[in-house]
Amino acid sequence: MINFDGNIVQFGFGAVGKSFYEKVSKEIHFNENKYFVITANKNEFAPYINLGGLACNFIESEITKDNFKEVFEKYLNSGDLLIDFADTVGTKDILSWCAEKNIMYINTGEADWPENWYSIFNENLLKNELKEKYCNSSSVNKYPIVLQHGNNPGLVSHFVKAGIAYIASTQYKKDKHLKELIKHNKFNEAAYKLGIKMIHVNDIDLQKVNDNYNNDTLFNTWCIDSFFFEMLSESTINIGTHENINFKDDCKFIDYANGFLELKRIALDQKCNTYYPNGGFDGFLVLHEETITIAKSLEVKEGENVIYRPS
């Protein structure tokens, strides 16, 4: 178990936040008097108390672009930890503040303030600029910052590595070079050697509906704001180096250098064929950050030239 003596602020207490709170004490040994939960929803107080939280450490506050620094600095100092489960908040702004204040920060996914309908491609480039800025400084960003490490992009990125390792160990048992690549975490070179061209990340909800189901009704089990944003944004793909784009008229823009492709159609109007363990299904092509981060992590370069990247 990890011992942590500093303050911990959990920002957000929805379904995922509650699940995390229930389990965090099994992973981290901390002082319960130093664990704070910040949420805008006063109705979360009862489940927070039922899960063993201290009443005085429950902070009901609507976090905005104008007040987030003022609220967070009451509970966080250098070396403390901010765990972000919130939506419609400015990831980039919070990241910058944490880096400047030397506060550890981890969040589950990309977000921005409600007034900004953002591009995941542009946000990715801006995050890379911030990474370069803070990585070269000796006075700030002294503690780890991990972005987008929820189920996806986070967990599915580990699944990709596990999948590559599984293919190598089951279909190429005698390939010693592949074993060495996996052993030394060179998954990009392993994917290149295996000739992996496309990776699908799929969500399929198999929960039963206790109601008369018909195709005119949407039963949503995901965060409403995120679902709204993702379904009404243009579909995106990160294109591999092998791709020959013969549907350019359907594209809003293509950036071959980074592999960014945005279609003119929104996700609600764009379906594609995909698979899950029980077979094929038609899914909506929804934008999500792992299309960028997984493809980027598996790039192989010769000098400055990208010679391999899967879609």
Predicted regions located by residue number:
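Rossmann-fold cofactor-recognition segment
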Residues: 52-65
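Adenosine-phosphate binding glycine-rich loop
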Residues: 126-194
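Rossmann-fold NAD(P)-binding glycine/threonine-rich loop
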Residues: 92-100, 108-143
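Hydrophobic/small residue at the entry helix of a nucleotide-binding pocket
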Residues: 16
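NAD(P)-binding Rossmann-fold cofactor-contacting core
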Residues: 29-49
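Short amphipathic alpha-helix with an adjacent loop that forms part of the alpha/beta core around
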Residues: 66-77
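N-terminal glycine-rich "phosphate-gripper" loop used for MgATP/nucleotide binding
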Residues: 81-91, 95-97
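C-terminal catalytic/substrate-binding lobe primarily of soluble NAD(P)-dependent oxidoreductases
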Residues: 166-311
